[in-house]
Amino acid sequence: MDWRVLIVLAPVIIAGSWALFNIGAAAIRQVQEFLNRDKLA
């Protein structure tokens, strides 16, 4: 694989993984809030 391809793809992969990480963290937070609300009711 050409090094130029890596230079082009690296920022895209980093941004994609960062977005997935943030979405996953937000989803876990929402699930935890939902479970906590379920216990309080």
UniProtKB/Swiss-Prot annotation:
One of its GO terms (biological process) is photosynthesis. The keyword Thylakoid applies. InterPro entries: PSII_PsbY. Its main location: membrane. The chain crosses the membrane at residues 5-23. It is a single-pass membrane protein. It comes from the Bacteria. Keywords: Membrane, Photosynthesis, Photosystem II, Thylakoid, Transmembrane, Transmembrane helix. GO terms for molecular function: manganese ion binding. One of its GO terms (cellular component) is plasma membrane-derived thylakoid membrane. It is found in: Cellular thylakoid membrane. HAMAP family: PSII_PsbY (MF_00717). Loosely associated component of the core of photosystem II (PSII), it is not always seen in crystals. PSII is a light-driven water plastoquinone oxidoreductase, using light energy to abstract electrons from H(2)O, generating a proton gradient subsequently used for ATP formation. PSII is composed of 1 copy each of membrane proteins PsbA, PsbB, PsbC, PsbD, PsbE, PsbF, PsbH, PsbI, PsbJ, PsbK, PsbL, PsbM, PsbT, PsbX, PsbY, PsbZ, Psb30/Ycf12, peripheral proteins PsbO, CyanoQ (PsbQ), PsbU, PsbV and a large number of cofactors. It forms dimeric complexes. This is Photosystem II reaction center protein Y. The gene is psbY.
